[in-house]
């Protein structure tokens, strides 16, 4: 037990050494039996199964189906500078 004026030093615990073979086994089993639940991954997989490339966010040829919140605007894109 410590006295009122002396702070106790925290006890530092050392980690056990990690073997390279343990790391290899852990990396392989991280997502072994888990389905990826990302919307981006789902869209990419759907386009891949359809045999086409997924639309890019940088493409000017959007269809309006890439996002639910924004529909394509009529006419050419306006400049942000003028």
From Swiss-Prot:
Modification Phosphoserine, positions: 2
InterPro entries the record matches: MUSTN1
UniProt record, GO biological process: chondrocyte differentiation; chondrocyte proliferation; embryonic limb morphogenesis; glucose homeostasis; muscle organ development; positive regulation of chondrocyte differentiation; positive regulation of chondrocyte proliferation; positive regulation of gene expression
Disulfide bonds: none
Keywords of this entry: Chondrogenesis, Cytoplasm, Myogenesis, Nucleus, Phosphoprotein, Secreted
Secretion signal, residue range per the UniProt entry: none
Location in or out of the cell: Nucleus; Cytoplasm; Secreted, Extracellular space
Family: Belongs to the MUSTN1 family.
Function comment: Required for chondrocyte development and proliferation. Plays a role in myoblast differentiation and fusion. Modulates skeletal muscle extracellular matrix composition. Plays a role in skeletal muscle function. Plays a role in glucose homeostasis.
Protein name, as recorded: Musculoskeletal embryonic nuclear protein 1
Record organism: Rattus norvegicus (Rat)
Lineage, highest ranks first: Eukaryota, Metazoa, Chordata, Craniata, Vertebrata
Gene: Mustn1
């Amino acid at each position: 037990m410590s006295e009122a004026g002396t702070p106790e030093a925290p006890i530092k615990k050392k980690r056990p050494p990690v073997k390279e073979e343990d790391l290899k086994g852990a990396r392989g089993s991280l997502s072994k039996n888990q389905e990826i639940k990302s919307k981006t991954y789902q869209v990419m997989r759907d386009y891949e199964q359809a045999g086409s490339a997924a639309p890019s966010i940088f493409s000017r040829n959007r269809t309006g189906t890439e996002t639910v919140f924004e529909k394509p605007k009529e006419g050419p894109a306006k400049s942000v500078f003028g």
